[in-house]
């Protein structure tokens, strides 16, 4: 059976990367929340 997680660096960056987050208002909200929470890593 095929495993569900087949990691790809490019796909990960494209979907969950910093620039993708910055593009939308909600994405920026995500980054803001993660900054306030004190996350070391904000996005993929």
Swiss-Prot record:
InterPro entries: Ribosomal_bL34 (IPR000271). One of its GO terms (biological process) is translation. GO terms for molecular function: structural constituent of ribosome. Keywords: Ribonucleoprotein, Ribosomal protein. Belongs to the bacterial ribosomal protein bL34 family. It holds the Pfam family Ribosomal_L34. GO terms for cellular component: ribonucleoprotein complex; ribosome. The gene is rpmH. This is Large ribosomal subunit protein bL34. Residues 1-23, 29-44 have a biased composition (Basic residues). The keyword Ribosomal protein applies. Disulfide bonds: none annotated.
